[in-house]
Amino acid sequence: MANIAHEMKAIYVISYRELRKFIREKSRIMGTMARPILWLFVVGGGMSRLVRPVGGINYIQFIFPGMIGMTILFASIFSAISIVWDREFGFLKEILVAPISRFSVVVGKAMAGTSISMLQVLILLVFVPVLGIKINALQFLLLLISSGMLAFSLTCFGILVSSRMSSYEGFNIIMNFLVMPMFFLSGAMYPVKLMPPVLREIAYANPLTYGVDGLKNILLAGASGTTMGPEYPAIVDFAVVAGFLAVTAVLSNLSFRRAA
């Protein structure tokens, strides 16, 4: 029991450090929040004049779940970059010589990334009444659970990549080749069913597709069966995200152990 308490404290300390770093970086907070808001009201506002409402859902409402997905994607994966920074500045060595398991380090980093993502999701949800989207208490709870699962899995994915990177530049290049395609091929901006066949097949293999679709099942349930509605049943979205979480959690832990 004492050992478990020690590891839990280590997870808390690592997470708390990352959260304090995030709160101090005002430019990072502004940058990560500005991106989805600009896409929502600038791109969404412009496209809503070209795309007719379907099933009572307009284009801005349609992309709102995708903007939540974008917020989670960028916040979670780029939270994992702290491993690269810690390695470059020697702090990672200090953590690794401490009497804590590698598993606790990974969980601490993943919990921090998830917490940062969820804070930003909560801020983004302020726009729900403005957009005319109505959610009840159960939908709000399901939204938090779905967002938390997606955030944890994507942070673990970022840790999986960053644990093998020795420099910030290398991580940034690889992530840009992964993050942007993941976002654009997730159904966040346009329905997967309307994509060209080749891109549609890639989208089916993209775990973010099911994360975004799960959010659509919660927020846009009234548009089910239309092009603006969710693509898959909610149980399929949940199963894929849960599987992705399990796989990335295991692989990120193994990768960090080997690289550390």
Cite the ranges covered by each PLM segment:
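Residue-level recognition of transmembrane alpha-helices
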Residues: I14, T32-M33, I63, M67, ...
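Hydrophobic alpha-helical transmembrane segments of multi-pass membrane transport proteins
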Residues: P36-V43, Y59-L131, G158, F177, ...
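Transmembrane helix segments
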Residues: G45-L50, S162-T209, D213
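Aromatic- and glycine-rich beta-strand/loop motifs that create alpha-glucan
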Residues: M1-R35
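Alpha-helical transmembrane segments and their short interhelical loops
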Residues: R102, V106-F177, P230-N253
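Short helix-capping/hinge motifs at transmembrane helix termini and TM-loop junctions
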Residues: V43-R52, F74, V128-N136, S163-S167, ...
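Short hydrophobic, aromatic-rich alpha-helical segments embedded in or entering the lipid bilayer
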Residues: A2-Y16, A188-T226, A234-I235
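Short cytosolic juxtamembrane segments of multi-pass membrane proteins
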Residues: L254-A260
